[in-house]
Amino acid sequence: MIIRSPESEVKILVDRDPVKTSFEEWARPGHFSRTLAKGPETTTWIWNLHADAHDFDSHTSDLEEISRKVFSAHFGQLSIIFLWLSGMYFHGARFSNYEAWLSDPTHIRPSAQVVWPIVGQEILNGDVGGGFRGIQITSGFFQIWRASGITSELQLYCTAIGALVFAALMLFAGWFHYHKAAPKLAWFQDVESMLNHHLAGLLGLGSLSWAGHQVHVSLPINQFLDAGVDPKEIPLPHEFILNRDLLAQLYPSFAEGATPFFTLNWSKYADFLTFRGGLDPVTGGLWLTDIAHHHLAIAVLFLIAGHMYRTNWAIGHGLKDILEAHKGPFTGQGHKGLYEILTTSWHAQLSLNLAMLGSLTIVVAHHMYSMPPYPYLATDYGTQLSLFTHHMWIGGFLIVGAAAHAAIFMVRDYDPTTRYNDLLDRVLRHRDAIISHLNWACIFLGFHSFGLYIHNDTMSALGRPQDMFSDTAIQLQPVFAQWVQNTHALAPGATAPGATTSTSLTWGGGDLVAVGGKVALLPIPLGTADFLVHHIHAFTIHVTVLILLKGVLFARSSRLIPDKANLGFRFPCDGPGRGGTCQVSAWDHVFLGLFWMYNAISVVIFHFSWKMQSDVWGSISDQGVVTHITGGNFAQSSITINGWLRDFLWAQASQVIQSYGSSLSAYGLFFLGAHFVWAFSLMFLFSGRGYWQELIESIVWAHNKLKVAPAIQPRALSIVQGRAVGVTHYLLGGIATTWAFFLARIIAVG
C-alpha cells in the first residue's frame, strides 16, 4: 500500500461581495459612528468627526473588518503617491528645463515651475541659466532622472501618464479588495507567506529589476552623457535592450552573453559590475556601476531570504518557533507570546515598522550627502540641504509615530491576563528603574552639554579665549569619532579586495572631488565644536526617548492613576476632584514628545547646514585653492551659544530678510508667514479652555440680541483638541520658517 503525505488543502482566503458599494454613506457624514451620524448639535462634532474618521478601532471591534479597512486604505495611499509622482514627472515634462540642464548640469540650475504673470508674481521666475526663467527646485528629481537614463521630456510625459494609470489601478484595487473580494483574517495573519512575498517579491525581484534597468539602460546612456554626447544622438532605451552588440561596444563582456555566468567566470562582468568605492570624478556621484552591482547583490540576498519561511510545503522556518526559541538569561519566557501580539495587534506591528523605517530614513539622510548616489547631486547644494533636512524631519515624525502606536497598543490591545513573565511583562515590571535611569542620563547630558557652552560664552564675554574649550585652547577632540573616520579611511585594502577607495570621501585620507569648479565632497574634519554639538544631540534625543518611552510604559497604569487603561488613549484629566492628574494620558506624551523631537531635529539640521557651508561646500580655483562658503568659521564660532545666534542664525538670515524685490521674495513672505503660524500656535498652547468658553458665551449673547444665533451651538475646543491644534501649528510654522531660511540662503550663496 502507498502511504501519501496528506495534500495541503488550498485555503479559500477571500470573502466575495462582503460590503455593498453605496454612495449613500457619503452623504451621511459620520456614518461610521452612532453618535456622529446624528449630525452636529455643537461645533465639537466637526472635531470629533476628524478625530475618528480613520480610527477604525472605534468603528468596530471585529479585527477582520478593521484589517480590511486598513488594507483598502493602503491602496488609497498608494494611489495618492502615484498621483503625486505623476505630477512631478508631468512638471518635468511640461514646465521644466530638464533637457537644457542635461546638456550642462554644472552651470544650469534645475527648474520645473514657471509662475504665471498675475499681480507681479512673475518676479519669482529667476534666471536659472540657459535662457530659462523659473523657480529653482531642490527636490533632486533631475538628478534621479539622469541616473535612470531619461534623456527627453517626452519620456517624462510617458512616465507621468503611466503613473496616472497606476494611480487609477490602485484606487480600483482598494475598492475591489474591500467590496468585491475581501481577504479573510487568516490571510492577514499568514506571516510566512507575507515575508515570502515582501522579501522575495518586493525587495528581491524589485532590486533585481532595478539592477537590470541600470545595467541595460542607465549605464550605457550615462556613459554617453558623461562623454558629452548630445542626448538627442543617444540610442533609445529599447535599442540597448534589444541590440546586444550596442552594449558590447561599451561593455565588452556583453559580447560573451551568459557564458561567463554559467561557467562561474563571474569576474568577466567586472566591466559593468564594479566595486570601486568613492565618487565618479566626472559627475561627483557614486559610480553607477557600483550601484548596479549593489542592487544585484541586494536582490540575491533578499531572494534567498524570501525562501526561508515555511508556507505550503513542510520546509523552512516558522516565525512562531523562532520567536519562542528566543530566551535570554534575564528574560524569563523571552519572546513567547510576541507572535500572538504581532498577529492580532496592528498597532504593535505598525509601531515596530515605524521605529525601523524612521531610523532607516535618518540613515538615508546621512548617506545622501556622504555617498551622493546621483550624478551632479553633490554640487547642487540647495538639493543636498533639502534632502538632508527632509529625511531628518520625516525620520523624526515616524519615530514619534512609533511611540504613539506602541502606546495605543498598550491601551487597546494589550491583555495583561495572558501575558506573564514574557519579555514585555518583565520590561513593564521594572519600568520605574528604566525611566529613572533614563531621566538621570537626560539630566547629566543636559547640564554637561549645555554647561560646556555656558562656560565658553562666559569666558568669551570676559575676554579670556585661552580658557575656552576650543581647538586652539582647551581641546576636547572627538577621539572616538576620529578613530572611526581613520579606520574607514584606511579600510578599503583590508576589507574589500577590489575596492580602490573608501566608501565615503568624508572619512578622510582621500583627495577632494570637485565638479565644474565646485566642491562635491572632501574629508570632513571633526573637532571640539563637533564634540560640543554632538552632546547636545545626545541630550535632545535622550529627552525625546524619555518622554515617549514613559508614555508607552505608563500607558495602562501608574502610581498616580492605577486605572489609566480604562480612561483610554487620550483624556484631559482623571475627572473632577483629582487635581494634578492632567496631561498624563498616552496621547499627551506623544504631544510633548513632538516638541522635543522638533528640538532634536532642529539642532541636527542647523549643525549640518553650518558645518557643510563652513568646511565642505565652496569653490575651487585653478590653483586648487578651496574657498568655503562661510570660510571655515564653524570650528571657532559654534562653540558659544552667542556664536550660533550671531554667526549662524542672524548672519545667514540676511538672504531671506533681504529677499524682497528679488526672485527669492516668496521665501521672505514665507519666512514672515510661517513665523506668524508658529506664534498663532502659542495662543492654543498657553491658554485655558474656560477663557474661550466665557468669550464664546458673550459673543453668542450678542448674536442672540441681533437674532442671528446659529443652530449649531458654538463650543470652545476641548483641552486635547486645543493641544492638537497648537502642536500642529507649532511644528508647521517652525518647519516652514526653517525651510524659507535654508532655501533663500543656499540658493543665494550656493
From Swiss-Prot:
Annotated keywords: 4Fe-4S, Chlorophyll, Chloroplast, Chromophore, Electron transport, Iron, Iron-sulfur, Magnesium, Membrane, Metal-binding, Oxidoreductase, Photosynthesis, Photosystem I, Plastid, Thylakoid, Transmembrane, Transmembrane helix, Transport
Binding-site residues for chlorophyll a, renumbered to this chain: 683, 691
UniProt-annotated location(s): Plastid, Chloroplast thylakoid membrane
Cofactor binding description: P700 is a chlorophyll a/chlorophyll a' dimer, A0 is one or more chlorophyll a, A1 is one or both phylloquinones and FX is a shared 4Fe-4S iron-sulfur center.
Residues that span the membrane, as ranges: 70-93, 156-179, 195-219, 291-309, 346-369, 385-411, 433-455, 531-549, 589-610, 664-686, 724-744
Reaction it catalyzes: reduced [plastocyanin] + hnu + oxidized [2Fe-2S]-[ferredoxin] = oxidized [plastocyanin] + reduced [2Fe-2S]-[ferredoxin]
Main subcellular localisation: plastid
Record-listed E.C. numbers: 1.97.1.12
Binding site for [4Fe-4S] cluster: 573, 582
Gene Ontology MF terms: 4 iron, 4 sulfur cluster binding; chlorophyll binding; electron transfer activity; magnesium ion binding; oxidoreductase activity
Pfam families: PsaA_PsaB (PF00223)
InterPro entries recorded: PSI_PsaA, PSI_PsaA/B, PSI_PsaA/B_CS, PSI_PsaA/B_sf
Keyword Nucleotidyltransferase: no
Any single Gene Ontology cellular-component annotation: photosystem I
GO terms classed as biological process: photosynthesis
Record Gene3D superfamilies: Photosystem I PsaA/PsaB
Binding positions for chlorophyll a' per the UniProt entry: 675
Protein's membrane topology: Multi-pass membrane protein
Stored HAMAP family: PSI_PsaA
Role noted for this protein: PsaA and PsaB bind P700, the primary electron donor of photosystem I (PSI), as well as the electron acceptors A0, A1 and FX. PSI is a plastocyanin-ferredoxin oxidoreductase, converting photonic excitation into a charge separation, which transfers an electron from the donor P700 chlorophyll pair to the spectroscopically characterized acceptors A0, A1, FX, FA and FB in turn. Oxidized P700 is reduced on the lumenal side of the thylakoid membrane by plastocyanin.
Sequence similarity: Belongs to the PsaA/PsaB family.
Oligomeric and partner information: The PsaA/B heterodimer binds the P700 chlorophyll special pair and subsequent electron acceptors. PSI consists of a core antenna complex that captures photons, and an electron transfer chain that converts photonic excitation into a charge separation. The eukaryotic PSI reaction center is composed of at least 11 subunits.
Protein name (database record): Photosystem I P700 chlorophyll a apoprotein A1
Source organism of the structure: Platanus occidentalis
Gene name of this polypeptide: psaA
